[in-house]
Regions:
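N-terminal helix-loop segment corresponding to the beta1-alpha1 unit
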Residues: 1-178, 182-191, 371, 377-405
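Terminal low-complexity tails and localization/encapsulation signals of metabolic enzymes
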Residues: 1-13, 222, 238-240, 324-405
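Glycine-rich beta-alpha junction loops
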Residues: 44, 126-128, 199-204, 241-243, ...
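Short, surface-exposed beta-strand/loop micro-motifs that present aromatic residues
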Residues: 61, 232-238, 347
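Active-site Gly/Thr loop motif
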Residues: 221-234
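Aromatic-enriched alpha-helical interface/lid elements that frame and gate functional surfaces
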Residues: 233-310, 314
């Protein structure tokens, strides 16, 4: 049994026609669980993020591990025919093309369903069909329209984008739930189906309780920064090193005296303004100011240790680079090594894999992030094309291999 065959989705084949984050992330989740994922890219340029600077390269590398890449010209008849062959043999197709693009190319769900009635087709768009259905969608569009950006950041600073492509990633997660549901339903009926996942509706659901809050109270809540409206001492605080921060979360009656003891501030515990949860909320700004003044003299690691030893929720505010040296992630097997592209060179890289595990559920790092078209010949050979057919496609520019660019 091969490494992939031991994984839960080893019998699932996926064709991904994706760019940027949402579709690539969706297929990555399936790939980490063992699915055979073929990423279809445009010859010459590939995924948009391949040509979007270092941050784009990071996205391509981190989100396209465990996949094979074929560079295939879908504007050509022979390229579309090859794509049809791939989809005909696949269990799942995932795409995040613009509204109507797949249908205009003749590779949309209706086209592929005629070839493969069992196909599960995930389409990730900005919006579900409706008044906004034809609008272009991207992560910040969803964050803006859902209210997420308005609630992020500190009061008076204006709307702020979340520090990762959260609406893209969320739509991918919902999309994968839909794919797995459709595959389960196919076991009963033998039929595939169209699955719709969107950025705006995903972000809108997450903001649902704030919409309910506005409905209840008649007004929107202001942005929260790093705080929480239900708790008096729940924020990030700068320590004695510049730009080294700690989160502290005092959320129960037990946490409050434990916090005061841990930071050796019995005066705060004795202060009548902070005697009860309600009074602490009434004097939240004063309490936060007093805590900030005290914690500014603490070393970050010493403070976190003292609070955790006292049973008070606390955490260092890490930079992404610190994840790669995190003992917990290392010991739980969450950090993986692979090879990817950086500045025209191949380089050993690290990232965090899909965090799913169970008695018989594993995720594994198997394949490096592919070069554009690295597996074009291999993928078509798996689909029954002989060397002469493949050479002809290369000669006509329908497919591309890295050494022929």
């Amino acid at each position: 049994m091969t490494q992939r065959e031991a994984l839960p989705l080893s019998d699932v084949s996926v064709v991904e026609l994706g760019n940027i984050v949402s579709a690539p992330f969706a297929s990555l989740l399936l790939a980490d669980l063992g699915a055979d994922v073929v990423k279809v890219e445009r010859p010459g340029s590939g995924d948009i993020m391949r040509n979007a600077g270092e941050s784009g390269e990071a996205v391509v590398n981190a989100f396209n591990r465990n996949k094979r890449s074929i560079a295939l010209d879908l504007q050509s008849d022979r390229g579309r025919a090859a794509y049809h062959d791939l989809a005909e043999a696949a269990d799942v197709v995932i795409e995040n093309l613009g509204p109507g693009v797949a249908d205009r190319l003749g590779i949309g769900y209706d086209d592929l369903n005629e070839l493969n009635a069992g196909l599960v087709y995930l389409s990730i768009k900005g919006f579900q069909p409706g008044p906004y259905g034809d609008r272009p969608g991207m992560d910040m569009v969803a964050e803006a329209m859902s209210g997420l950006a308005a609630m992020t950041g500190r009061p008076g600073d204006g709307p702020v984008r979340v520090g990762t492509s959260i609406a893209d990633i969320g739509s991918a997660l919902y999309g994968v739930i839909g794919v797995l549901t459709a595959l389960r339903e196919r076991e009963r009926t033998g039929e595939g189906q169209f699955v719709d996942a969107t950025l705006f509706e995903s972000a809108a659901q997450w903001m649902g309780y704030w919409a309910t809050y506005a409905d209840m109270t008649g007004h929107d809540h202001p942005p929260l920064g790093s705080s929480h409206p239900a708790f008096s001492l729940y924020d990030v605080f700068e320590t004695d090193e510049s730009d080294r921060w700690v989160f502290v979360g005092v959320t129960t009656d037990r946490h409050w005296p434990a916090f005061c003891e841990a930071v050796d501030r019995p005066d705060l515990l004795a202060d009548e303004r902070f005697e009860t949860p309600a009074s602490r909320l009434d004097h939240k700004s004063e309490l936060t100011e007093a805590a900030a003044e005290e914690l500014a003299d603490w070393n970050r690691e010493d403070l976190v240790d003292a609070l955790l030893d006292a049973g008070v929720p606390a955490a260092p505010v890490n930079e992404p680079s610190e994840l790669l040296e995190d003992d917990h992630l290392r010991e739980t097997g969450m950090l993986v090594d692979f090879e990817g592209d950086h500045g025209g060179e191949r380089k050993r890289l690290r990232t965090v894999k899909t965090p799913l595990s169970g008695d018989r559920i594993e995720t594994e790092q198997r394949l490096d992030a592919p070069r554009l078209g690295e597996h074009s010949r291999e993928v078509l050979a798996d689909s029954g094309y002989d060397d002469a057919d493949i050479d002809s496609l290369i000669e006509d520019g329908v497919i591309e291999l890295p050494d022929e660019r």
